Design a protein with these regions (language model features):
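P-loop/Walker A NTP-binding region and its immediately flanking N-terminal helices
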Residues: 1-153, 162-163, 290, 294
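A short helix-loop-helix "switch/interaction" segment in the helical subdomain of ASCE P-loop NTPases
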Residues: 173, 182-196, 218-225, 234-240, ...
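Amphipathic alpha-helical repeat elements characteristic of tetratricopeptide repeat
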Residues: 5, 145, 162, 181, ...
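Helix-rich C-terminal "collar"/helical-bundle subdomain used as an assembly and partner-interaction module
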Residues: 233-320
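Conserved C-terminal helix/linker of AAA+ ATPases
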Residues: 206-233, 265, 282-288
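Conserved AAA+ ATPase core "coupling" helix
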Residues: 144-174, 178-189, 198-201
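C-terminal helical "lid" of AAA+/P-loop NTPase domains
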Residues: 184-190, 196-210, 233-236, 247-252, ...
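Short conserved motifs of the RecA-like P-loop NTPase core
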Residues: 101, 165-167, 178-190, 214-218, ...
Length: 320
């Protein structure tokens, strides 16, 4: 897969994120005293890649033996995490760089419950002599304060369009794929700033391209045109009291076009403040509603039911 083939392996290769890279370099000047780290920011901005680059620099050839990668949302509970870290900490050996600890990379920490995070804090305390932690999350606000206070925090921002497209161009060159600027811009826009998603889309499109030439027409299925107009039409119907029309538009977006519920809400969040039919107070209330239903979907609620309920509430809001 291209995302692994072209994943940066050193800090020099990391795309954008100069502030974070410079901060990490400063810490790595004294590797034996490096603190626990917390990386937060949107998906596909290089958090996991940065963690692995740090691990390679610290552990060298002992990388696989002295680094434990865990995904908080995949594990069966904090008890499993505790036992794996306990077993890992008991076999720590000195790395070539002189560090005398292992590195635990724990992804999606903001998906853990507060109770699980409290238990994780205790694990970090009891394992501090033999382990350093790199915690990765999308939202820093989802991490309890006692953990944040024990970490050096690095905030990853969305990648600059220019930097991301330059990286996509370098991949195309390496793979002997020709792609014009407008094609790469469409891929970037489709990705929403998620470089991992952009690279995956680029690979799928390149696989189906003819004679190594990537054109806009080939992107229609994997990187469709912006759905802002359709989402705006859906919102307008709801605001004007036509709930059934709004729901039909929602079903078309989800069923026929394959747009996820959370993608619809993200687009709606941009578009609802542009509706002249809602005064500023109602726009604020609509944004609050969108946030509430986005959270419900993030917790695994049914998309059809939640988006229908959201449109019903927006319809009621428009009639006030």
């Amino acid at each position: 897969m291209w995302i692994e083939k072209y994943r940066p392996r050193t800090l020099d290769e990391v795309v954008d994120q100069r502030d974070s890279v410079d901060g990490i370099r400063a810490l790595l000047k004294t590797p034996a005293t490096i603190p626990h780290l917390l990386f937060s920011g949107p998906p596909g901005t290089g958090k996991s890649t940065m963690a692995l680059c740090i691990a390679r620099q610290l552990m060298g050839e002992s990388f696989r033996r002295l680094v434990l990668e865990l995904n908080a949302s995949d594990e069966r509970g904090i008890g499993v995490v505790r036992e794996r870290i306990k077993g890992f900490s008991q076999v720590i050996q000195t790395a070539p760089s002189g560090v005398q600890f292992g590195l635990v990379i724990l992804d999606e920490c903001d998906e853990m419950t507060r109770d699980a995070q409290t238990a994780l804090r205790r694990i970090m305390e009891t394992s501090s002599r033999t382990c350093r932690f790199i915690l990765i999350c999308n939202y820093q606000s989802g991490i309890i304060e006692p953990i944040q206070s024990r970490c050096s925090i690095f905030r990853f921002r969305q990648l600059e369009k220019r930097e991301a497209i330059a990286y996509l161009k370098s991949i195309c060159k390496a793979e002997n794929v020709s792609a014009d600027q407008d094609v790469l811009e469409r891929v970037f826009e489709f990705s929403g700033g998620d470089l991992r998603r952009a690279i995956n889309a680029l690979q799928v499109a390149a696989t189906s391209s003819k004679a190594g030439k990537l054109e806009l027409a080939q992107l229609s299925k994997i990187a469709p045109e912006d759905e802002s107009d359709s989402v705006r039409t859906m919102l307008l119907a709801a605001v004007q009291g036509n709930f059934l029309k709004a729901r039909d538009q929602m079903y078309e977006l989800m069923g026929k076009r394959g747009i996820s519920g959370r993608e619809i809400i993200r687009t709606a969040n941009r578009e609802v403040v542009k509706l002249a039919e809602l005064d500023s107070r109602k726009q604020v209330e609509a944004v609050r509603l969108l946030g509430e239903y986005d959270f419900r979907l993030s917790q695994g609620a049914n998309e059809d039911i939640q988006l229908s309920a959201m449109l019903a509430q927006i319809s009621l809001l428009g009639s006030k």
